[in-house]
């Protein structure tokens, strides 16, 4: 069955090629397609295009299909093109002529669009929860490590004193910017395209505001052409937000690979979280961080993959956009898995103490010494040259306790004043900005009408 069936058989080779992986991927859209159909038929009854009797049999049937799909028992049968055709077929089998009415005033184009929006909205919500978990873990470890000094680097050269608190806190704050991008992506997904039909609207007296409220959307994609043009654009926006999270995770993983090596020795993974070598018995490799890095890099390439599918397409819908699903749908599980394993690894890694007692890192305190002399009246440039000469001839020494060192750094965002609570407040405000409660209530109301 095809929604566009005109009574003649399509060439088998053409059908295989054009359907591609759609049947497999469309299973992820099943619950969302059913929700969209429930909202659509409810609206059709409201505007007089469907009788109350028809609606009274359609909604219970759709609710049962929803339960089946939610339980993972929904199947797209052999010969059925996609999830949309399967839902209509099952309704028609069960309800007869009534099932054939659900597509009134709707195109497969806006049906796909609303499915994608609902799917994306739900997936971003899951990812946001996992970003929050990693954020809180990083902040917790940052607090635990705020008195554990380590060298900071520029150009991979020892630069100034840092701390585990400052290092891990940096990645926590990076996640607040990533969350801001996720919020923007969520807001783009939270706009209703239903009613735009094939991109030019419908002569049926549709009530698009009603379906917007029924599905918990914040607003409409108003212009019918733009609703179709937004296909690919939304996915690219989401992919960019996800690639930003992936970049943060990937950089953290690279740091951990480096800091775990014998040449640094700042952190240590439990033996149970490392792998070995078939020839070198001493090896305890941080494969978990290496694979996090590789997976993150792959996600970072995704926005370009999507852009290259949609670039220079003229106005209107084109089948090219079907290919976006193949790279877009796996994205969510890929990043979610990375977030979970990164959180687990950060929770369990050991932070080493007394790193800065190594004479190798003494020059990290040179700026502090320059500032001390400048505060005592030596012109800054002269103090700089004095300390530089002492480092060159090997006479530079700096002695201070951890507490004394931290006390010299009082400004916001320094090792002595991490501002973790202020960073947490930023994250909390971003999380609160998403109207999840209203969305959940709308979907619950729709399922229980």
Model feature map: region roles:
Residues 57-60, 225-230, 386-390:
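Short linear loop/turn motifs
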């Amino acid at each position: 069955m095809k929604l566009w069936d005109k009574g003649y058989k399509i060439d088998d080779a053409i059908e295989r090629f054009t359907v591609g992986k759609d049947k497999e991927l469309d299973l992820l859209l099943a619950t969302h397609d059913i929700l969209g159909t429930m909202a659509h038929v409810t609206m059709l009854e409201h505007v007089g295009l469907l009788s109350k009797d028809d609606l009274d049999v359609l909604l219970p049937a759709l609710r049962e299909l929803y339960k089946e799909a939610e339980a993972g028992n929904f199947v797209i049968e052999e010969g059925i093109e996609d999830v949309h055709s399967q839902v209509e077929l099952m309704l028609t089998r069960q309800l007869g002529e009534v099932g054939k009415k659900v597509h009134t005033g709707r195109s497969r184009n806006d049906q796909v669009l609303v499915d994608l929006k609902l799917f994306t909205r739900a997936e971003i919500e899951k990812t946001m929860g996992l970003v929050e978990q990693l954020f809180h873990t990083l902040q917790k470890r940052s607090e635990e490590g705020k008195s554990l000094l380590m060298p900071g680097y520029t150009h991979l050269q020892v630069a100034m004193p840092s701390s585990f608190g400052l290092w891990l806190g940096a990645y926590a704050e990076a996640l607040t910017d990533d969350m801001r991008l996720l919020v923007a992506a969520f807001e783009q997904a939270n706009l209703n395209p239903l009613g735009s039909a094939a991109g030019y609207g419908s002569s049926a007296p549709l009530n698009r505001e009603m379906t917007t409220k029924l599905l918990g959307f914040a607003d409409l994609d108003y212009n019918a052409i733009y609703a179709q043009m937004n296909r690919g654009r939304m996915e690219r926006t989401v992919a960019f937000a996800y690639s930003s999270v992936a970049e943060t995770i990937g950089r953290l993983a690279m740091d951990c690979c480096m800091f775990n090596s014998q040449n640094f020795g700042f952190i240590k993974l439990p033996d149970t979280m490392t792998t070995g070598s078939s020839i070198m018995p001493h090896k305890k490799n941080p494969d978990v961080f290496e694979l996090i890095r590789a997976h993150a890099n792959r996600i970072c390439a995704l926005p370009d993959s999507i852009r290259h599918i949609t670039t220079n397409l003229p106005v209107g819908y084109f089948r090219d956009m079907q290919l976006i699903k193949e790279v877009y749908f796996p994205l969510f599980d890929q990043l979610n898995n990375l977030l979970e394993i990164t959180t687990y690894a950060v929770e369990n890694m050991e932070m080493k103490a007394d790193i800065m007692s190594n004479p190798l890192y003494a020059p990290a305190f040179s700026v502090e010494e320059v500032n001390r002399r400048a505060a005592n009246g030596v012109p800054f440039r002269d103090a700089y040259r004095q300390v530089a000469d002492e480092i060159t001839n090997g006479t530079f020494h700096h002695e201070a306790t951890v507490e004394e060192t931290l006390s010299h750094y009082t400004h916001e965002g320094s090792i002595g004043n991490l501002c973790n609570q202020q960073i947490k407040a930023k994250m909390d405000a971003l999380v609160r900005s998403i109207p999840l409660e209203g969305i959940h209530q709308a979907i619950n109301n729709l399922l229980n009408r």
